[in-house]
Amino acid sequence: MSQNFGKISQVIGAVIDVEFEPGKLPPIYQALRVTNPAIDDQEFNLVLEVAQHLGENAVRTIAMDSTDGLVRGQQVKDMGKQISVPVGKKTLGRILNVIGEPVDEMGPIGNEKEYGIHREAPAFVNQSTKVEAFTTGIKVVDLLAPYARGGKIGLFGGAGVGKTVLIMELINNIAKQHGGFSVFAGVGERTREGNDLWMEMKESGVLDKAALVYGQMNEPPGARARVALSALSIAEYFRDEEGQDVLLFVDNIFRFTQAGSEVSALLGRIPSAVGYQPTLATEMGELQERITSTNKGSITSVQAIYVPADDLTDPAPATAFAHLDATTVLSRQIAELGIYPAVDPLDSTSRILDPQVIGDEHYAIARQVQYVLQKYKDLQDIIAILGMDELSEEDKLVVARARKIQKFLSQPFHVAEAFTGSPGKYVELKDTIKGFSEIIAGKHDDLPEQAFYMVGTIEEAIEKAQKLAV
């Protein structure tokens, strides 16, 4: 097949119009390439993706890199396929960009296979209908807001409350306990944070179990709107071809929507509520529906969600909520108490916190833990004004147990060993349930609350109490 060439007719920011000969229009989502001397000296170094057919043998495309330096009349090459990214084990330990090129200066990927970034969601007949919990080894998550295998989890939290450390611990635990791989999509991230994550993953030894795909804040909107899809294709390969349970991290899903809204106006679409793109729900659906369990494997995704101006009704976070199975809310108040992971046990939710999925014992203990913590929260005003002495004996007991539970929800992480000096702990679900049921039953009312801080199992707490008593 002979090469198909067109030429640039118009450049509008990140959007480029290209004219082709009659009958040779490339289809929607096809990749085109053009030479941009402002990027580097390579020929055909800028990738464009066809977004619209304008009539008059012209297509409107979105650029995946800078368009500075392009001129009208320049030659554009039709690649004959959509944007494709390398897939397979060779991508592990590497950083790729939106078009699958390595950006870590460690040479070519050397992959055998590529996947297109736009793929169909798995057919109904291939989807797994089994609902089961996905054990993370993190007590507060497994007990109170368990993740579903193949589910979608929203991770909410401001700056500096430990989102990245939690993400790294999950990558570490899935690699060591499940032997699984992780894919990290940095969507509209700060470049510094992306670099920090890479360095920290290298130091904590989890880098060779993860593939990283970055489209940072300084990238044009085309790259930021597509980088999540590139990462998803890499994850789909591990699920479908290798039968893996994959973890997909997206940080930040809001930036995916934001990039879509930047491009949307340039494409000539009339904006909808709050200036977002009219195709907001469709774009989100196309991404989220591909994240699921099939009869071969699963993709479980953890998505950090930025909430603009703390307004949960904003169309961007509101659209993301519709797809979530669980939410993990990180709280600054809890971080200030020195309790890490700073997960809010009363604010975090899960669709599978249900006796039919997790069993009656787990459900009962989780609800009792939440009841005790809520009671303590209600009593805090009285304690602040009148002091502990004014409480009834029953309330004093509730407060004592709640404080022990609060401390016991903390846990040393493997990836933070260098900072905390204490070895990380992976806690099995049965040990988590046993520990909390014993605290609630009052078996450890005689132990000091400090014994429960930063330990794994209840046995470790008892051991720590004996050391403190010496």
UniProtKB/Swiss-Prot annotation:
Reactions performed catalytically: ATP + H2O + 4 H(+)(in) = ADP + phosphate + 5 H(+)(out)
EC number annotated for this UniProt entry: 7.1.2.2
A GO molecular function held by the record: proton-transporting ATP synthase activity, rotational mechanism
Chief place of localization: membrane
Species: Geobacter sp. (strain M21)
Assembly: F-type ATPases have 2 components, CF(1) - the catalytic core - and CF(0) - the membrane proton channel. CF(1) has five subunits: alpha(3), beta(3), gamma(1), delta(1), epsilon(1). CF(0) has three main subunits: a(1), b(2) and c(9-12). The alpha and beta chains form an alternating ring which encloses part of the gamma chain. CF(1) is attached to CF(0) by a central stalk formed by the gamma and epsilon chains, while a peripheral stalk is formed by the delta and b chains.
InterPro entries in the cross-refs: AAA+_ATPase (IPR003593), ATP-synt_VA_C (IPR055190), ATP_synth_F1_bsu (IPR005722), ATPase_a/bsu_AS (IPR020003), ATPase_alpha/beta_chains (IPR050053), ATPase_F1/V1/A1_a/bsu_N (IPR004100), ATPase_F1/V1/A1_a/bsu_N_sf (IPR036121), ATPase_F1/V1/A1_a/bsu_nucl-bd (IPR000194)
Highest taxon of source: Bacteria
Pfam families the record matches: ATP-synt_ab, ATP-synt_ab_N, ATP-synt_VA_C
Transmembrane regions: none
Keyword annotations: ATP synthesis, ATP-binding, Cell inner membrane, Cell membrane, CF(1), Hydrogen ion transport, Ion transport, Membrane, Nucleotide-binding, Translocase, Transport
Family: Belongs to the ATPase alpha/beta chains family.
Name the record gives this protein: ATP synthase subunit beta
